[in-house]
Amino acid sequence: MSTTLRLAFLWVPTIACFAIGCTLSPTQVPARAKHERNGHTADDALVQFSLLAALAADDYAGGAPLRDLLAAGDFGVGTFDRLDGEMIVLDGTIYQALADGTVRAADLDGTTPFAAVTFFGEDGRIENLTAATLDDLDAQLDRKLPHRNLPYAMRISGEFAAVTLRSVPAQSPPFEPLVEVVKHQVTWQHHNVRGTLVGLRCPDWMGTINVSGYHWHFLSDDHTIGGHVLGCEFQNGSLRYDECTSVVIHLPQSTEFDEFDASEVTDEDIDQIERQRAQTSPK
């Protein structure tokens, strides 16, 4: 068996696109490598806009148009201009979970400083999944997902006995680093709510490109509850996953991006920002 790695920079007038493609033999990934979308065939790519390290370093303003995001995928997570809420992309709609606890369909004329999406096509499923905590869920998936070093898009549907969520209010310049912003996050606990966990798992090699490990957002079935997940508890959930066999990164061409220093963003900062967990299972 052989694995090939493709690296390329593709320059267009407003965006630099860094593509990393990992092509595996069919015996390694038996599921289909491409999915049909609107009569077209789309690669199983995780398409990312900017870098987590840039976001952590306070590059919050402007970014890619949300319409461009939907052209790249129908499923994923991210944030909005000036960190104005948590982004959930599900079934081709972008939802904005605001710091006042409301959820709305996002204005597609808006922008995102950071997001990652894919065209979700099921490559496998895990039924009757039960988790007492978010850490319990992550540990189970580490054992059950087929490949350690591929990114995964995952959706878990069911009734959640409890879910702890957060969002942050829109920021104003001069921007603070994200590790300071999350100290002022707003959190909620909800009980006995039906909905979907929308998540990504990125392998360790992705480092400051994205969150290594698991990154979960949540949206209730009635689209009234949503946010970044700090904790959850559920029984008999249905998980579907999509293996992403390539990664495409659209890099901003802004002064803020050009000047940020990735070495100043520590793993401890990323833990505080994106791997934060509720201290106990929600009750």
Annotated model-derived regions:
Residues 2-12:
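Bacterial N-terminal signal peptides that target proteins for export
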Residues 135-200, 207-209:
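Long, positively charged binding patches that form subdomain-scale interaction surfaces
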Residues 211-219:
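Histidine-centered divalent-metal-coordination microenvironment in nucleic-acid enzymes
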Residues 52-113:
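N-terminal low-complexity or amphipathic/hydrophobic leaders
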Residues 220-263:
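A hydrophobic, small-residue-rich beta->alpha segment in the mid-to-C-terminal subdomain
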Residues 92-142:
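Hydrophobic alpha-helical segments and helix pairs
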Residues 262-280:
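Conserved catalytic alpha/beta cores of large enzymes that bind or transform nucleotide phosphates
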